[in-house]
Each structure stands twice: as structure tokens, then as C-alpha cells.
């Protein structure tokens, strides 16, 4: 007998954890640390993009069934990357290659997690 590991509650937990990490980094960690080292600024800025992508993928996919999750996650990642590229033209921010990299890494890790979550396991 094969049992799928997929659960809406699991996807919700991962998504809400991603949102909590975004708020934690933005409103708690950044203000407490007054270090303006370039590496620190890059890591903190890109980590928000990373966790926001993870949150978007898992919260949106928690409302779908198991089929097509990888394709849906791929479209979400491409949408996040497209948004990063058009931000300067919309007047909403600046283009940052490190954010694109963080989004790509988050998408890869999320799709790997999704593929493991919906795979069948022998009991």
C-alpha cells in the first residue's frame, strides 16, 4: 500500500513560517543590527526574497490538489522573478541580481520539497 504524504496543513505551516521569517528579518533583525557591511545588506535583503517566495509557493499551493504542483510552483517562481525585473519600471524598487538568485534558489528548494511531499512512500 502506498500512502501520499501531502497535506494542506503541512503546506500552510511552511507558508506561514515563510511569512513569519520575512517579518522577523524586516522588522526585528535589521533594526537591531546597525552593521552596514555590503555582505550583510545583501544577505538580509535577499533572505526576505527567499522566504517570500517560499511563502507564496506553499500558501498558494495549499489550496490546490496534488496534481500539477510542480508546474504551478514554477509559474509562481517565474512570476516572482518577472516582478523583480519590472520593479524599477513600475517605480516600486530597484533591480537586484541577488534577489533573483534568492528567488531561484527558493524555487528549487520548494519544488524539491513539493516533489518529496507528493511522492509515494512504501510503509
Q: Where on the chain are the PLM-derived regions?
A:
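Bulky hydrophobic segments
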Residues: 1-123
Amino acid at each position: 500500500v502506498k500512502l501520499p504524504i501531502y497535506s494542506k496543513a503541512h503546506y500552510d505551516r511552511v507558508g506561514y513560517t515563510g511569512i513569519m521569517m520575512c517579518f522577523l528579518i524586516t522588522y526585528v533583525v535589521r533594526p537591531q543590527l546597525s552593521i552596514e557591511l555590503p555582505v550583510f545588506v545583501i544577505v538580509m535583503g535577499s533572505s526576505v526574497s527567499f522566504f517570500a517566495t517560499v511563502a507564496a509557493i506553499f500558501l498558494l499551493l495549499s489550496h490546490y490538489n496534488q496534481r500539477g504542483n510542480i508546474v504551478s510552483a514554477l509559474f509562481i517562481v517565474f512570476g516572482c522573478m518577472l516582478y523583480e525585473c519590472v520593479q524599477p519600471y513600475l517605480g516600486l524598487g530597484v533591480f537586484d541580481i541577488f534577489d533573483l538568485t534568492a528567488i531561484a534558489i527558493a524555487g528549487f528548494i520548494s519544488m524539491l520539497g513539493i516533489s518529496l511531499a507528493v511522492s509515494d512512500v512504501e510503509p
